[in-house]
Each structure stands twice: as structure tokens, then as C-alpha cells.
Amino acid sequence: MASGRKTKNTWVLVVVGLIVVGLAAGLEAMRPLANPLTVAIRSLALMGYQLVFLSIVSSAYILELVRFFGRPFVKVHHIASVTGLALVTLHPILVAVDKGSAGVFLPKFDSLRVFLQLGGRPAWYLIALAVLAALLRQRIGSRWRWVHILNYLAFALATAHANLLGTNFQDLAPRVVSWAMLFAVLAVFVRKRLPKPKPAQKPGAS
């Protein structure tokens, strides 16, 4: 039976999408002119990073998003999650094309700094697992939530990777914003694991 709920405020998703693209384009415009492949590599990473952030933060406002968009939260959430995964997948693929090597998909453990500098590599696998777990949540039951937690670790690794290696994160402003985003993600992680307050009992209720 079809739901009588009417989809609304879809324009907000369009605006958010334009902002994501605009921020990536703005940061890229601040850098010296590069070849199209390099621009694509950096822009895809920036847009994917933002969408992964939005998918994580949105999970803390399920009821509010359902009311605002008039559609199941999962649909809105998955738009950001799957699109973000697609973008952060295209990023290393183009890097591999540029380098002429598939080695860019392999994490490196030479030292802690090297691991974090190339943190985008393990982050990609973690994000892919988290998204896959969410898509298969009906098959694997409540266990999908534990796998989905990998998103938080992936975002932390991606933030370290961006700050230590990302060309567009060499200036102070992008660095500060990225660490503020990581702080927001960690706040969501903590908030979702705090005990929820019980609803106030009505006077006279037994």
C-alpha cells in the first residue's frame, strides 16, 4: 500500500548538492592551475569527503529529517552515503591512472605518520564496508550497526589524510573547517551512544 506522505522540501537537497560542488570548486580555484586529471582527483575527494560527513551527521537527526523531507530517512541518508562512496572510489581510481599503479589502493604501515598520511586508503575500505552493511541491514540484522560504526573511523582517517597530504588543505581555513567537521562527527558518535532520556510521565499515570 502506498504511503500517503507527500515528499517535500526536495529543493533543499538540490541546494546542498550545489553547495558541495561549489565548495570543492572554490577550494580548487584557490590553487595554481593544474591539468584536468589532477583537478578531477582533488575535486572528487573534496565532494566525497563532504558527503560522507553529511551522511554521518544526518544519522543523528532521523526524526527531524523524516518530518522535513516527508520521506523515509533511509532514502535521504543513502543518497549521501552511496554518492559519497562513489566519489571517494573515483578519487583513488583516477590517482591510480595518474600514477600508473594500483598500489594506491594498498594501505602502508611504514610508520604512524605514513599510515595517517595515506589514511584515505584504509578509509575507502571502511566506508565501503559501512555502506554495504547498511544496504544489507535486513539480511544481517542488528549487526549492521556495528559495521556501520566504521564510518566514524574512516572519516577520522580521511581527515588526517587530507591535512597531511591534500593540496587543497594547505591553507589554515580548510584545515580548521576539516577538524571542526571531525569534532562534529565525534560529537554525533558520542550523542548516539548516550542513554536516551525517558519521556516524562503524565500526572496520575500509574
Regions found by a protein language model. Name each.
Residues 1-206:
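Membrane-embedded alpha-helical bundles that constitute the cytochrome b-like, heme-associated redox core
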